[in-house]
Amino acid sequence: MALETVPKDLRHLRACLLCSLVKTIDQFEYDGCDNCDAYLQMKGNREMVYDCTSSSFDGIIAMMSPEDSWVSKWQRVSNFKPGVYAVSVTGRLPQGIVRELKSRGVAYKSRDTAIKT
């Protein structure tokens, strides 16, 4: 697991609304999302960080070998990079971003386990 994917602080944590990766707001702005930056372009853009992440999430899981873990398969993160992931993320991506993802062939499924989509 790369050191930059581990949250550097327990305050100001946010979870990506697309993949549920958890980092500090500054880490998302400085490095982007390790899994989704090709689509969400959060790196260097604090406004996109606020739009594409949520500070409201439940539970965290540290994934060292996502490809070998049954938990990562259950959480739908087995194809993602090692890191810390939220179990459930409250919120949805803005409609414009969802349309852009769809046009690029990326299916968006909410990571909020409280709502069924």
Curated annotation (Swiss-Prot):
GO terms for molecular function: protein heterodimerization activity; RNA polymerase II complex binding; zinc ion binding. Widely expressed. The modification N-acetylalanine is found at residue 2. GO terms for biological process: negative regulation of DNA-templated transcription, elongation; negative regulation of transcription by RNA polymerase II; negative regulation of transcription elongation by RNA polymerase II; positive regulation of DNA-templated transcription, elongation; positive regulation of transcription by RNA polymerase II; regulation of DNA-templated transcription; regulation of transcription elongation by RNA polymerase II; transcription elongation by RNA polymerase II. Coiled coil: none annotated. Keywords: Acetylation, Activator, Metal-binding, Nucleus, Repressor, Transcription, Transcription regulation, Ubl conjugation, Zinc, Zinc-finger. A zinc finger (C4-type) spans 16-36. It holds the Pfam family Spt4. Zn(2+) binds at residues 16, 19, 33, 36. Residues 2-40 are annotated as: Interaction with SUPT5H. Ubiquitinated by UBR5 when not assembled in the DSIF complex, leading to its degradation: UBR5 recognizes and binds a degron that is not accessible when SUPT4H1 is part of the DSIF complex. It comes from the Eukaryota. The keyword Acetylation applies. GO terms for cellular component: DSIF complex; nucleoplasm; nucleus. It is found in: Nucleus. Interacts with SUPT5H to form DSIF. DSIF interacts with the positive transcription elongation factor b complex (P-TEFb complex), which is composed of CDK9 and cyclin-T (CCNT1 or CCNT2). DSIF interacts with RNA polymerase II (Pol II); forms DNA and RNA clamps that stabilize Pol II elongation complex while maintaining the nontemplate DNA strand in the transcription bubble and nascent RNA in the exit channel. This interaction is reduced by phosphorylation of the C-terminal domain (CTD) of POLR2A by P-TEFb. Component of the DRB sensitivity-inducing factor complex (DSIF complex), which regulates mRNA processing and transcription elongation by RNA polymerase II. DSIF positively regulates mRNA capping by stimulating the mRNA guanylyltransferase activity of RNGTT/CAP1A. DSIF also acts cooperatively with the negative elongation factor complex (NELF complex) to enhance transcriptional pausing at sites proximal to the promoter. Transcriptional pausing may facilitate the assembly of an elongation competent RNA polymerase II complex. Belongs to the SPT4 family. This is Transcription elongation factor SPT4. It comes from Homo sapiens.
